Amino acid sequence: MADLEEQLSDEEKVRIAAKFIIHAPPGEFNEVFNDVRLLLNNDNLLREGAAHAFAQYNLDQFTPVKIEGYEDQVLITEHGDLGNGKFLDPKNRICFKFDHLRKEATDPRSCEVENAIESWRTSVETALRAYVKEHYPNGVCTVYGKKIDGQQTIIACIESHQFQAKNFWNGRWRSEWKFTITPSTTQVVGILKIQVHYYEDGNVQLVSHKDIQDSLTVSNEVQTAKEFIKIVEAAENEYQTAISENYQTMSDTTFKALRRQLPVTRTKIDWNKILSYKIGKEMQNA
């Protein structure tokens, strides 16, 4: 082990540390960071070399953050990344600094948004917030309106998590939906992600995702938002139902097959006659 450590350059050590951090399960960033910190034993090297991993983790996980002075949380995503550690809160029309290690928002300031698409963004956000409130008690959503390749685009992100460290499990739901505002009909593209980690008497992770495509009728802002939510609700319900059914099937078949049906003697023990067995007599005489 010592020889291997001597062969690793600082760059290689940081690269390995960054991979551990990026793949930290939901709700376990601090635990992984502290373990990596002990292994690397060089705080300056870790902070300077793995800073990109802290940022990538928060972007990938749709980390929610509370901004002082504002009621609703906002998600940290690539769509709100303004560069130089600043992010956009489209609902409140502010930008703020975000510390990826401490996961804290500071210095909120007013910020310009895409006014040409703001009425569409607001309508979708209003409908999505009502949907999230109904289906995800701990959920947070952020809706962006952006011009991408010359097309006015709506991007809706949802995050919901349950962190139960005392019960040895943590989990997170993420979904991202996009559509462009074009006459008549448009294509809705979504990706749904579930990640759960269970670590009592073992180490099991569920990592699943599903890509979605559907067509959306475009009319006025409010009606289009309603039709969009119908697509989101149907797809997310179907996905969650499928995950539950697959889990039950695995419990009844795959996991059951891993358990030994009979002892190595291929004979079941009749516990009512245990004293007549040799082992029973030995236990009685012990």
Curated annotation (Swiss-Prot):
GO terms for biological process: actin cytoskeleton organization; barbed-end actin filament capping. It comes from the Eukaryota. Keywords: Acetylation, Actin capping, Actin-binding, Phosphoprotein. The modification N-acetylalanine is found at A2. GO terms for cellular component: cortical cytoskeleton; F-actin capping protein complex. The modification Phosphoserine is found at S9. GO terms for molecular function: actin filament binding. F-actin-capping proteins bind in a Ca(2+)-independent manner to the fast growing ends of actin filaments (barbed end) thereby blocking the exchange of subunits at these ends. Unlike other capping proteins (such as gelsolin and severin), these proteins do not sever actin filaments. This is F-actin-capping protein subunit alpha-2. It comes from Plecturocebus moloch. The gene is CAPZA2.
